[in-house]
């Protein structure tokens, strides 16, 4: 399984949607709360090329985007491929 990092905020509905989808797929992920960890927000913004919106989701260090991009990957079947190809 890839190392999945989800930069999120506590009251963000898009973050909840992304995390729920990953949980539904049985994927383990590291949640990084950028509200509680301001230094992590800076890291997220660098990784996301300046984007300040959450969630920002990384698979094995590669940014895939936010909730909409994660859902699009799921709808196309590519999310399952990513999870399976990494040994899920």
Positions of PLM-derived features:
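Short, glycine/charged-enriched secondary-structure capping and boundary segments
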Residues: 20-22, 45, 71-73
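Local sequence-structure signature of Cys/Sec-based thiol-disulfide redox active-site neighborhoods
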Residues: 1-28
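Residues that form or flank phosphate/diphosphate-binding pockets in enzymes
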Residues: 16, 39, 65
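Structural micro-motif
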Residues: 49-58, 68
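Anionic group-transfer/hydrolysis microenvironments
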Residues: 7, 35, 62
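Non-catalytic, surface beta->alpha helical segment in thiol-disulfide oxidoreductase systems
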Residues: 59-86
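Thioredoxin-like thiol-disulfide oxidoreductase module
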Residues: 34-51, 78-84
């Amino acid at each position: 399984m890839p190392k999945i990092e989800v930069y999120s905020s506590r009251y963000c509905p898009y973050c909840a949607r992304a995390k729920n989808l990953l949980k539904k797929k049985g994927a383990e992920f590291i949640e990084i709360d950028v509200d509680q960890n301001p230094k992590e927000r800076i890291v997220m913004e660098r990784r996301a090329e300046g984007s300040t919106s959450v969630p920002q989701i990384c698979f094995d260090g590669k940014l895939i985007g936010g909730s909409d991009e994660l859902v699009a990957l799921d709808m196309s079947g590519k999310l399952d491929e990513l999870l399976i190809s990494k040994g899920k």
